[in-house]
């Protein structure tokens, strides 16, 4: 696939100050199709207003993982805008429309957004990569000069180390990395920067050193976890509103006999 000019991709970084969570709006300028990555329930009106003002049509919400610090707006956005909820294949989300395996993805107009499975912070983490625009959305797998914790939600320090090294640090050095959080006002980093400067996962660190670092952390229990995790397993909806999950990409691949699945729902969404 040939390179697509970056100017054809609309990009907005959105912020929730209560939980220091970043959400991301991406849209194809030609088709006006949009995705929201990690939308936050409390900002439903802000995000729908932005879509309306920019005359965009939300086709997908993409989750990087089952969050423990906020409740997603994905379910409410689906109810309001008929968007499709997309998660990683290992998240356990009960009512997603698509559960993507690594190496598959979704089409956004002229752009392709690839799912890279990056477990370790949780067992179902996904990094979303738009290679044509040199962008990757790492969730909590890789933060700016840090990473997500590995002491709950089936976290595993060794898996996280290998995920970052094999699926994020193998992206081109100039790839801009956008995390799910930052607590110091930083907004973006690059693969090259994190390889060099990340004190936990930089190339100077060994796997054993990383495991030791993560094991020594004494972090407080997330204050929203008991509400957020059960709600996010339902895409943020109340139990009565949850519906059965959609087909997994593994099933679609088996049916089509292909290793790459291109999902394009056109203008009917």
Question: For the regions a protein language model found, what residue spans apply to each?
Answer:
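Conserved beta-strand hairpin/beta-sheet module of binuclear metal-dependent hydrolase folds
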Residues: 2-57, 128-139, 145, 269
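Short hydrophobic-aromatic micro-motifs
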Residues: 34-37, 113-115, 135-138, 179, ...
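A contiguous binding-surface segment within folded domains or other stable secondary-structure elements
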Residues: 125-162, 166-170
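Active-site HxH/HxHxD metal-binding segment of metal-dependent hydrolases
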Residues: 20, 41-117, 134, 197
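Core dinuclear metal-dependent hydrolase active-site scaffold
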Residues: 13, 25, 105-131, 135
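Accessory terminal helices/loops
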Residues: 2-4, 162-176, 180-269
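Active-site metal-binding loops of divalent metal-dependent hydrolases
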Residues: 39, 66, 90-91, 121-122, ...
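Divalent metal-coordination and catalytic microenvironments
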Residues: 26, 38, 65, 77, ...
């Amino acid at each position: 696939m040939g390179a697509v000019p970056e100017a054809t991709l609309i990009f907005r970084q959105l912020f929730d100050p209560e939980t220091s969570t970043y959400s991301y709006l991406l849209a194809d300028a030609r088709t006006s199709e949009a995705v929201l990555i990690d939308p936050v329930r409390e900002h439903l009106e802000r995000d729908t207003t932005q879509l309306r003002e920019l005359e965009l049509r939300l086709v997908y919400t993409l989750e990087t993982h089952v969050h423990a610090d906020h409740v997603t707006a994905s379910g409410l956005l689906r109810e309001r805008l008929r968007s499709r909820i997309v998660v990683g294949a290992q998240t356990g989300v009960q009512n997603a429309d698509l559960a993507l395996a690594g190496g598959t993805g979704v089409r956004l107009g002229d752009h392709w957004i690839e799912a890279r499975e990056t477990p370790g912070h949780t067992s179902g983490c996904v990094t979303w990569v738009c290679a044509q625009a040199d962008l990757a959305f790492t969730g909590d797998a890789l933060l700016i000069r840090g990473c997500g914790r590995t002491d709950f939600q089936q976290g595993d320090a060794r898996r996280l180390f290998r995920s970052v090294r094999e699926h994020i640090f193998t992206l081109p050095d100039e790839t801009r990395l956008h995390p799910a959080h930052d607590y110091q006002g930083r907004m973006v980093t690059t693969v090259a920067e994190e390889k060099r400067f990340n004190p936990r996962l930089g190339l100077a660190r060994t796997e054993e050193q990383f495991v030791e670092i993560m094991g020594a952390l004494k972090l407080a229990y997330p204050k929203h976890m008991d509400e957020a995790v059960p709600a996010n397993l339902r895409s943020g909806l109340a139990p009565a509103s949850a519906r059965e999950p959609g087909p997994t990409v593994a099933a679609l691949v088996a049916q089509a006999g292909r290793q790459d699945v291109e999902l394009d729902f056109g203008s009917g969404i």
